[in-house]
Design a protein with these regions (language model features):
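Conserved ABC ATPase "signature" region
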Residues: 106, 110, 118-136
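Catalytic Walker B motif of ABC-type/P-loop ATPase nucleotide-binding domains
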Residues: 165-169, 174
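ABC transporter nucleotide-binding domain
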Residues: 180-260
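Conserved ABC transporter NBD signature motif
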Residues: 64-75, 81-82
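Walker A (P-loop) phosphate-binding loop of ABC-type ATPase nucleotide-binding domains
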Residues: 43-47
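A short, proline-enriched helix->beta-strand linker immediately N-terminal to the Walker B motif
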Residues: 159-163
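Conserved structural motif at the start of ABC-family nucleotide-binding domains
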Residues: 11, 25-28, 83
Length: 287
């Protein structure tokens, strides 16, 4: 008889919940992700960082369960293995200013138990080269620009080619060229594992993500491909010289015309929808 192997998903969340006092930051999220780059979109305070911190095992849920790479982070033995196979870039990484870029990355490598000294040195050099900081490896963190510091933290997250890479607004502070580099770096990582990132930039999602999850008030409002998110707004967008009062939302565009979102009025021709339009609709559906 053929043995049926069902591979563990990279991320499996069931009724995942996290509260801070009276605030429910993550409110019973069910989600299964496996492979590729997944973009997490949502307004300020939606719960993205809280969710990512739980995926990175730095925060434990109050209720519900999560399995990451088939492992249970609540179990100390499984958590250790998981942390070796996980990379995390926090939202505002606190870096020791007096360390050099190399010392900082090496320190994280030690914490991740890369015990072989020579291999650790090679790995640190590799990840610093990957983020384009090979020539600044001996610069002190405090002497680096904001974007370079972000790249040092990214290098630390890439140590050991993680199977699950969790990135909180990774493009913050990067210039356009560095953003392009980041995209190819993450696309490459996603060929071997799963990348989950938060962003406020729908263009980033369109360029990089195979899947997108829209979160508001701690709940998932949409999960699907970027094309499906855009599709939500297809036939629900139109332009006009002044804001149309029939729209649920209107805003002025760069050319001075108004873009309207809502039920298309009779006799009005729809405009092609964008990912932003789909995002606005997904966010509003939760209100
Ligand atoms: N450590 C904490 N203590 C108390 N409240 C918190 C804490 N962390 C988050 N919160 C609250 O939980 C909610 C979700 O916050 P979170 O940082 O996860 O949102 P976010 O989607 O990442 O926001 P942003 O886009 O602004 O980064 C917010 O209401 C926030 O104030």
């Amino acid at each position: 008889m053929t043995q049926l192997h069902i591979a563990a998903r990279s991320v499996e969340l069931s009724a995942l919940t996290k509260r801070f006092g009276r605030t429910t930051a993550v409110d019973g999220i069910d989600l299964a992700l496996d492979g590729g780059v997944v973009g997490l979109l949502g307004p300020n305070g939606a719960g993205k960082t809280t969710l990512l911190r739980m995926l990175a095992t730095v925060l434990a849920p109050d209720a519900g369960s999560l399995r990451l790479l088939g492992l249970d982070p609540a179990r100390p033995d499984e958590r250790l293995e998981l942390r070796r196979r996980l990379g995390y870039l926090p939202q505002a990484p606190a870096l020791y200013g007096s360390f050099t870029a190399l010392e900082l990355v090496d320190y994280v490598a030690v914490l991740k138990e890369h015990t072989d000294r020579d291999r650790r040195a090679q790995e640190c050099t590799r990840v610093l080269d990957l983020v384009g900081l090979g020539d600044r490896r001996n610069s002190r963190i405090r002497a680096l620009s904001g974007g370079m510091r972000q790249r040092v933290a990214l290098a630390a997250a890439l140590l050991g080619s993680p199977d699950l890479l969790v990135l909180d607004e990774p493009a913050t502070g990067l210039d356009p060229e560095q953003r392009l580099e980041l995209r190819s770096l993450l696309a490459d990582t996603a060929t071997r594992g799963t990348v989950v990132l938060s962003t406020h930039n729908t263009a980033e999602v369109a360029a990089l993500c195979q899947r997108v999850v829209v979160v508001t008030a701690g709940s998932v409002r949409f999960e699907g491909t970027p094309a499906e998110l855009r599709g939500l707004a297809e036939g629900r967008v139109w332009e006009s010289p002044i804001a149309d009062p029939r729209a649920t939302r209107s805003w002025m565009t760069a050319d001075g015309a108004f873009r309207n979102l809502g039920d298309l009025p009779a006799g009005v021709a729809p405009s092609p929808a964008t990912l932003d339009d789909g995002y606005f609709l997904a966010v509003r559906s939760g209100r």
